[in-house]
UniProtKB/Swiss-Prot annotation:
Name of the protein this chain belongs to: Cytochrome P450 714D1
Chief site of localization: endoplasmic reticulum
The keyword DNA-binding appears for this protein: no
Gene name tied to this protein: CYP714D1
Lineage of the species this protein comes from: Eukaryota, Viridiplantae, Streptophyta, Embryophyta, Tracheophyta
Organism from which the protein derives: Oryza sativa subsp. japonica (Rice)
Gene3D superfamilies reported for this sequence: Cytochrome P450
Length: 577
């Protein structure tokens, strides 16, 4: 029997090896043939694109080369970078007259070149994966209307940005995303945001105090020059920290400051251009990322354990006198409360706290920065918006206006149009990106499984065909009758918070927060662009000013140091500049 087994094994081994070799060759052949097969599927639908410049890297080498060439062409000269002349700046571009350059052609030069060569929709390659660049409004509409869980966020983004987002709602897919969205989305409904306006006004007090002290240091009547980015980020930090962590907001700030540092590290290299395997090597940068990731998790879990202990104590104290205070009902409390039914409850809490930071902070801070830049460059709109704020809040320049509440902010129509135009010219997200997890029919287009769909948000927002000849000018009046009347194909031409079912959860919070901050600032200050302001939008996960925003700030006409917006007091934080 043993000899038969030995004989059978010896006879079967070559067959097994041959079958394994044949199977391996078939798999390899299919892998090698897939790009050509996919390209042919798109070619039959009239879609072509640049040929891959590398067998393994696709079009990435050409993309890198064009970015390097654009950066070299934009390097500072002896005369310095472009400066702004509108609204009090010095010697450079007049934004009121000339409008804004299409910064996308500088940041993403390869897309601009390929669009001119191959049309509205074309195919390119990210390593071995097909990517479809889409500016056809009809196809964008189909992508937006798709509610299938077979389309979602690309897996390369999940892996490449895992330290920032983990498996939270912003990057999750399928049933996991649907389950998390059901828990997180209600926290950003307008009914919840309505109750946060006083919180926003309170969070603005350190900013007001900081700018007031700088004006006083400049002599009171003169303008103080301020790099405002740090103050605006500090304001947004306070808002989301108070909303997410309640009375623990000071500890929440420590978490979010580390997230900001982590975000800066992650944005140093584009997730598209980075080599995936390198993120596992113990380089200096990776060790800093791992350290910050661990610290953030530890800080969040420390709060979670305290909240869970408080909830347990409250339950066990039922019926006795003087029960302990119930656990707080803030974002963190809600996430903890709903974490029990999740497969990995601790990861659910940690990842979604990080996701709330990006949904509720980054968008607001950067949008507020661009909004103040645009108002500084267009003083007539600044005056109109200020007049509306004073009319709604009851101030007359000499008397202190009331602090805005939700109803007041909702009535500020001009301020709302200014914010919408800001989001059009400088949308926080540069792209809406999706991946098909099976072959999908999107209108007339068949997208094979594994296709990336790239919708360039900024390009659509600046499209002359949709917005008319003033597309690159700042003109909030275009939104006088709403988005639908402002442009052609509104679903495809205006999507500052994303597209379809995956629209940013924090959009209500961001819009109300920016409007509230603008109202508080306009009621107190007048501002112009500094001659030192260098206009250079840069891509760092989101589009933000590369060199910061320098403003010259003075008190609004007729006010003195004692005439302030009537708000509740808040602790003064030191400036971040």
């Amino acid at each position: 029997m043993e000899s038969f087994f030995v004989f059978f094994t010896a006879a079967a081994l070559p067959v097994v090896v041959a079958a394994a070799v044949i199977a391996g060759l078939c798999i390899t052949a299919a892998w090698l043939a897939r790009p050509r097969r996919v390209a042919e599927v798109f070619r039959r639908q009239g879609i072509d694109g640049p040929p891959p410049s590398s067998f393994l890297a696709g079009n990435l080498p050409e993309m890198k080369a064009r970015v390097a060439a654009a950066a070299s062409a934009a390097a500072p000269t002896a005369d310095g970078e472009e400066t702004a002349s509108a609204g009090g700046g010095g010697g450079g571009r007049d934004f009121e007259k000339d409008g804004f350059d299409d910064y996308c052609t500088r940041i993403f030069p390869y897309f601009h070149k390929w669009r001119k060569a191959y049309g509205e929709t074309y195919l390119y390659w990210l390593r071995r994966r097909p990517a479809l660049y889409v500016t056809d409004p009809e196809l964008i509409g189909e992508i937006g209307r798709c509610v299938s869980l077979d389309m979602g966020k690309p897996k390369y983004l999940q892996k490449g940005q895992e330290p920032l987002f983990g498996g939270g709602v912003l990057k999750a897919n399928g049933a996991c995303w649907a389950r998390q969205r059901k828990v997180i989305a209600p926290e950003f409904y307008m009914a919840r945001v309505r109750a946060m306006v006083q919180l926003m006004v309170d969070a603005a007090q350190p900013l007001i105090a900081s700018w007031e002290s700088r004006i006083d240091a400049a002599g009171g009547a003169a303008a103080a020059e301020v790099v405002v980015d740090g103050d605006l980020r500090s304001f947004s930090f306070d808002v989301i920290s108070r909303a997410c962590f309640g009375s623990d907001y000071s500890r929440g700030r420590e978490i979010f400051l580390r997230l900001r540092e982590l975000s800066g590290l992650m944005s140093e290299t584009s997730v598209i251009f980075s080599i995936p395997s390198l993120r596992h090597l113990p380089t200096g940068k990776n060790r800093r990322i791992w350290r910050l990731t661990g610290e953030i998790r530890s800080l969040i879990m420390e709060l979670v354990r305290e909240r869970r202990c408080a909830a347990r104590a409250a339950r066990e104290h039922g019926g006795k006198a003087a029960p302990p205070s119930p656990p707080e009902r803030d974002f963190l409390g809600s996430i903890i409360e709903n974490s029990g039914g999740q497969p990995r409850p601790d990861d659910f809490v940690v990842d979604n706290c990080k996701n709330i930071y990006f949904a509720g902070h980054e968008t607001s801070a950067v949008t507020a920065t661009w909004c103040l830049m645009l108002l500084a460059a267009h003083p007539e709109w600044q005056d109109r918006a200020r007049a509306e704020v004073l009319e709604v809040c009851g101030g007359d320049g000499a008397a202190a206006p009331a602090a805005p509440d939700f109803d007041m902010v909702s009535r500020m129509r001009t301020v709302g149009m200014v914010v919408q135009e800001t989001l059009r010219l400088f949308p926080p997200s540069s792209f809406v990106v999706r991946e098909t997890f099976r072959d999908m029919q999107l209108g007339r287009l068949l997208a094979p499984k594994g296709t990336y769909l790239f919708v360039p948000v900024s390009t659509m927002h600046h499209d002359v065909a949709a917005w008319g000849p003033t597309a690159r000018l700042f003109d909030p009046s275009r939104f006088r009758d709403g988005v639908a009347a402002a442009c052609k194909h509104p679903q495809a031409s205006f999507m500052p918070f994303g597209l379809g079912a995956r629209t940013c959860l924090g959009q209500n919070l961001a819009l109300v927060e920016v409007k509230t901050l603008v109202a508080v600032v306009l009621a107190r200050f007048e501002f112009t662009l500094s001659p030192e302001y260098r206009h250079s939008p840069a891509f760092r996960l989101i589009i933000e000013p590369e060199f910061g925003l320098r403003l010259r700030i003075r008190r609004a006409g007729g006010q003195d140091a004692t005439s302030q917006v009537d708000t509740s007091t808040a602790p003064v934080h030191s400036s971040h500049n």
